[in-house]
C-alpha cells in the first residue's frame, strides 16, 4: 500500500515536471512570425494563451482578427455620418470587412477544428488583402489607416502560425495530406478528412 502511494506520488511529480518543462509555447512560436512583439502581446492578452498548443494560439489570433474586423465595421458605420463624402470608399470597406467576418474567419476556424491548418491559410491571408483593398479605396489619407494596418499586421502574424502548425501536422501525420483520408492514427494525429467541405465550396484536395 505504501509502495502504491509512493508510485502515485512519483507519477504526479513527473506530470508536473512535464507541464513545467513544456510551459508556454508563445515565445518560441512567435519567433517564427514577422512581428515577435505584436505576436507575444496579442497572445499574452488572452488567458488561453499560456496553456494553448499551436492550434490554440492560431484560434486566439483568429479571434483577434474577428474582433478587429468588428471594430472596424463599427468605425465605418460611424464615418457614414461624419464623412458622407467618403461614402463610396466606405461602402467598399464595409464589403471587405464583412467578407473577413463572414468568409475568412469561419474558413480559418473550420480548418483548425478539422485539424488541417494548411487549408485555413487562405482565409488568414485574405483578411490582410481585404484590409489593403479597403485602404486603397481612399484617395489620399484615410480615417481607417490605423485599423487597416493593424489588420495587415495581425494577418501576417497569424499566417505564420498557421504555416508553423501545418508543418507540425505534416511531421506528425505524414507529408502527403491526401493520405490523411485513410484515417491515419499517430500520437499527434487522429483525423478523418473524407469529404471535408470548406465554406467557400473548397475541398481538401
Swiss-Prot record:
The name under which this protein is listed is Cell wall / vacuolar inhibitor of fructosidase 1
**Major localization listed first in the record, in broad terms:** other
Q: Which organism is it from?
A: Arabidopsis thaliana
After gene disruption, what is the outcome? Increased vacuolar invertase activity leading to accumulation of hexose.
Molecular function, one GO term: enzyme inhibitor activity
Keyword Signal belongs to the record: yes
Q: Which gene encodes it?
A: C/VIF1
Q: Could you tell me which InterPro entries the record lists for this protein?
A: C/VIF1, Invertase/methylesterase_inhib, PCW_Enzyme_Inhibitor, Pectinesterase_inhib_dom
In terms of SUPFAM superfamilies, this protein maps to:
Plant invertase/pectin methylesterase inhibitor
